[in-house]
Amino acid sequence: MNALAGRRIAKVSGTPGKTRMLNVFEMPAYYLLDLPGYGYAKASHTDRHAFRHLIRHVIDRPRLTGVLWLLDIRREPSDDDRAMQELFAERETPVLAALTKSDTLARAARARRAAELRSALDLEEDQMVVTSAREKEGIVELREAIAGLIQPRTA
């Protein structure tokens, strides 16, 4: 999110799954909501259930324009990822998947993993952007894709 904003708006932890509450960031043309991770978070069963409830509540909001779904390109989709994709499809929620941490893979492996994830999660090519915050890869493309996602709502 910091790379997307072009400045430090979110605290970054070295440990995945540290987000425990809804964080809202005002961007120039939209609001970005950072939700707790539903799958990788090292949280109690009760907390994970509460995270899922919060996510469903946000997805059901009528003003929701779309979801920016951050997925680690190195990891296989979890059962939780598949359940979220089913929820997005069921609710007809527009989805844009940002495949993060691409700098950890060779270029050929990035393309292969993107294709595998696209297939596994039943996404279209224009619903995915390969990104690396460290290398600033895909950030411009991600901003453009977000603009395309919110354009119908703001036009």
Q: Over which residues does each language-model region extend?
A:
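Canonical P-loop GTPase G-domain recognition
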Residues: 104-155
